[in-house]
């Protein structure tokens, strides 16, 4: 199935628009791609935060090898824009977690991150070689990871504040490269048994990834302020970082 591309809303930041297009293009060629069922009230959300309109749109798919592909684009008034995407693997497959986030405001991009995060001890060697096949851009403002992020991201994570349009373009190209490596790995992957020790370890690794991501208090505080604590918990636990199904 080929998902229908969405038209970008007026005033969307060029990097948000470019990354969303790259992500949609990358998942369009994955095997067995289909829409992932989701409560309709979580697909598109509208609220108020500090007197400004808050809108959140979610696109959710699954395919062979990946239990969930998620793209979230959020906007607060005419200022803050957020893109968040995570591809969660089926633990039966030896695949990493793809993740990318950007935060854009009137002054530009304040944060941009992309990673292929291992769910076992380390990334597969072949995957590392593919990532390293593209030279790493010389970004001028590399940011420090929060403690919870250091516990789950790989040593190939890129977390920066892009300095100008040239670095925004370089980051977009880097994300496209990570997406290509991820998509190739998904197509090539074969499943292992539920009882295999490697499968169990990947399952536990993904549980830990979700646990650490839920420690990002900034996300929870924004959602609680715009809606309420119960809704924020539901959104985070059921949509953003839901645990993988039991083996």
Swiss-Prot record:
Signal peptide: none annotated. Keywords: Oxidoreductase. One of its GO terms (molecular function) is cobalt ion binding. One of its GO terms (biological process) is phytochromobilin biosynthetic process. Its EC number is 1.3.7.5. It catalyses: (2R,3Z)-phycocyanobilin + 4 oxidized [2Fe-2S]-[ferredoxin] = biliverdin IXalpha + 4 reduced [2Fe-2S]-[ferredoxin] + 4 H(+). It holds the Pfam family Fe_bilin_red. The keyword Secreted does not apply. Catalyzes the four-electron reduction of biliverdin IX-alpha (2-electron reduction at both the A and D rings); the reaction proceeds via an isolatable 2-electron intermediate, 181,182-dihydrobiliverdin. NCBIfam families: PRK02816.1. Belongs to the HY2 family. This is Phycocyanobilin:ferredoxin oxidoreductase. It comes from Synechococcus sp. (strain CC9605). The lineage of its organism: Bacteria, Bacillati, Cyanobacteriota, Cyanophyceae, Synechococcales.
């Amino acid at each position: 199935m080929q998902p229908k591309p969405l038209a970008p809303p007026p005033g969307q930041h060029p990097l948000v628009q470019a990354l969303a297009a790259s992500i949609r293009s990358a998942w369009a060629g994955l095997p067995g791609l289909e829409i992932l069922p989701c409560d309709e009230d979580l697909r598109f959300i509208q609220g108020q935060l500090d007197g400004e309109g808050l809108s959140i749109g979610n696109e959710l798919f699954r395919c062979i090898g990946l239990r969930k592909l998620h793209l979230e684009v959020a906007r607060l008034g005419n200022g803050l824009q957020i893109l968040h995407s995570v591809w969660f693997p089926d633990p039966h497959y030896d695949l990493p977690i793809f993740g990318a986030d950007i935060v854009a405001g009137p002054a530009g991009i304040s944060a941009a991150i992309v990673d292929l995060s291992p769910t076992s001890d380390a990334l597969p060697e072949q995957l590392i070689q593919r990532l390293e096949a593209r030279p790493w851009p010389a970004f001028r403002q590399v940011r420090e990871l929060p403690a919870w992020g250091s516990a789950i991201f790989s040593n190939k994570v890129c977390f920066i504040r892009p300095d100008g349009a040239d670095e925004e373009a370089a980051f977009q190209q880097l994300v496209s490269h990570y997406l290509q490596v991820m998509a190739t790995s998904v197509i090539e992957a074969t499943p292992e048994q539920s009882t295999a020790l490697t499968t169990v370890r990947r399952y536990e690794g993904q549980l830990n990834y979700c646990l650490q991501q839920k420690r990002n208090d900034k996300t929870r505080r924004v959602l609680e302020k715009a809606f309420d604590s119960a809704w924020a918990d539901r959104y985070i636990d059921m949509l953003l970082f839901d645990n993988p199904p039991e083996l």
